[in-house]
């Protein structure tokens, strides 16, 4: 199976090589059709692929699904803004890793993000967990060839290759992706793991993706349990401000963390403390002083001294929290 796939890709590469041409310096190419923006920065366009990298369980998939929700709804989701042209509105997810139940639950969250009553007809989700690399590639080729396809998410790209440390195989796969996006004018989002030992995308495949991708984004799990999306490599624009998300128990879905996590000592009154308080007491509606300090420190992103001397007294004084018999709770207005 591996040999057949490699031979097929080699044959295609030989055929594609005949497409070499001199670049016309007197003819300006069509303008880039930018479809993914983050914080006003240009991240991804049709005819290119981008990469989302990160350690396992860092929530790479959550951000990818937010792209789907944004592309279909036309609104910003988790800080990501997708804008597909009218003739390229179809969105495709190739999920190679999740179980059926995990995929179902993730799609329900995407549905909630996009505020859809039902899943739209221009969205197609493939369950490819049991498929071989050659079978995965066949589905990808068919979806790219559909004239209305604008966005394809590959979760994850390692399932399109036998050996991600094989230089030749990795090179052929990346060149194949470049040919598919260019020929069919689609944008592909690859999800790739980062190696725990090197902190780089895995193998020769990861190195080549970083080299040829339009943008590489990295998802990092923070100490307080939040996840941060940041720019690692940006070819066509400056880095965007990192986007941080957290699990919002109030809506049973992910939300963008409020701005001002690292505010200065003198502007406590300008902060949306209510959101922070909800998160501090999300898992336990009653805290002792030691645990309260830990939670305040993590959620606000401040030092323990600042939490103890400034923040907690401020929250008590302004009735964001209440102290009853040595325990701390969210303040509840009796009226």
Show where each model-derived region lies.
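C-terminal regions of RecA-like/P-loop NTPase motor modules
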Residues: 3-9, 145-146, 222-335
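The Walker A/P-loop phosphate-binding site
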Residues: 7-109, 333-335
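Conserved catalytic network of the ASCE P-loop NTPase/AAA+ motor domain
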Residues: 44, 83-87, 116-119, 144-146, ...
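Phosphate-binding/switch region of NTP-binding enzymes
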Residues: 51-52, 57, 171-255
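Conserved inter-motif catalytic segment of the P-loop NTP-binding fold
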Residues: 85-169
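Amphipathic, non-transmembrane alpha-helical secondary structure
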Residues: 65, 69, 73, 134-145, ...
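Alpha-helical scaffold elements adjacent to nucleotide-binding pockets in ATP/GTP-utilizing enzyme cores
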Residues: 66-67, 102-110, 139, 172-176, ...
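Short gly/ser/thr-rich secondary-structure transition/capping motifs
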Residues: 30-37, 134-135, 197-200
């Amino acid at each position: 199976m591996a040999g057949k796939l490699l031979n097929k890709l080699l044959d295609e590469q030989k055929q594609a090589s005949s497409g070499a041409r001199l670049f016309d310096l007197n003819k300006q190419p069509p303008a880039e059709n930018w479809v993914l923006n983050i914080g006003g920065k240009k991240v991804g366009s049709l005819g290119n692929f981008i990469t989302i990298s990160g350690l396992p369980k860092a929530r790479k998939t959550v951000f990818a699904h937010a792209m789907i929700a944004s592309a279909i709804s036309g609104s910003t989701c988790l800080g990501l803004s997708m804008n597909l042209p009218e003739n390229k509105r179809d969105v495709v997810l190739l999920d190679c890793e999740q179980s059926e139940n995990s995929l179902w639950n993730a799609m329900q969250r995407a549905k909630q993000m996009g505020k859809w009553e039902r899943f739209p007809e221009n969205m197609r989700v493939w369950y490819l967990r049991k498929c071989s690399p050659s079978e995965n590639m066949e589905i990808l080729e068919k979806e790219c060839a559909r004239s209305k396809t604008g966005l394809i998410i590959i979760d994850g790209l390692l399932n399109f290759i036998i050996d991600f440390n094989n230089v030749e195989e990795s090179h052929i796969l990346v060149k194949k992706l470049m040919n598919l996006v260019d020929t069919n004018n689609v944008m592909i989002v690859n999800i790739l793991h980062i190696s725990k030992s090197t902190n780089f995308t895995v193998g020769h495949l990861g190195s080549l993706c970083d080299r040829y991708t339009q943008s590489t984004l990295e998802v990092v799990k923070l100490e307080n349990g939040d996840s941060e999306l940041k720019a690692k490599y940006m070819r066509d624009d400056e880095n965007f401000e990192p986007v941080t998300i957290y699990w919002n128990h109030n809506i049973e879905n992910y939300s963008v963390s409020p701005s001002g996590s690292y505010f200065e000592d003198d502007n406590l009154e300008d902060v949306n403390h209510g959101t922070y308080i909800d998160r501090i007491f999300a898992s336990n509606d009653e805290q002792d002083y030691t645990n309260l300090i830990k939670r305040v420190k993590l959620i606000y992103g401040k030092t323990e001294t600042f939490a103890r001397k400034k923040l907690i007294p401020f929250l008590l004084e302004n009735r964001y929290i209440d102290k009853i018999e040595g325990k701390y709770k969210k303040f509840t207005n009796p009226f």
